[in-house]
Amino acid sequence: MEEKIEMSMLLDFYGILLTDKQKSIMNLYCNEDFSLAEISEHTKTSRQAVHDIIKRCGKLLKSYEEKLKLMGKHIEKIKAKKNMLNKLDYLKENCKEEELQKLIEELKNELNNSLGG
C-alpha cells in the first residue's frame, strides 16, 4: 500500500487521537497532497517542524494500528463480504429454483448495502 494512502486510512481511523494541529497537518499532507513547504506556509510553522510532526504522527498512527488493529479488521470484513458476494453470485448462476434465486438476491443486496453500494 502506498505510504500516503496508508497514512490517510490510518488518519481516518485514529485521527481523533491526534491534536488538532497534528490532525490538520496530516490531513494537508495525506489527503490534500500539500508539500512540506505548502503546509509550512499554511500553518505558519517551519518546514522542519512540519516534517517532524508528519514523521512522529506516522509512527504514532502505526503504533495505534499495531495495538488496536481497527483498520486491519475493517479490511478483513470488506474482503469477507466480497467473498460472500462472489459465492452468492456462483450459487445464483447455478441455482434453478426461483425462490432460492430471490433469497440469494436479497442476501446480495444486504451485503452490497453494508459495503456502501
Curated annotation (Swiss-Prot):
Q: Give the top-rank taxon of the lineage listed in the UniProt record for this protein.
A: Bacteria
Q: Could you tell me which SUPFAM superfamilies the record lists for this protein?
A: Sigma3 and sigma4 domains of RNA polymerase sigma factors
Q: Which Pfam families match?
A: UPF0122
Signal sequence, renumbered to the chain: none
What biological function has been recorded for the protein in this entry?
Might take part in the signal recognition particle (SRP) pathway. This is inferred from the conservation of its genetic proximity to ftsY/ffh. May be a regulatory protein.
Q: Which family does it belong to?
A: Belongs to the UPF0122 family.
**Name this polypeptide is given:** UPF0122 protein CTC_01247
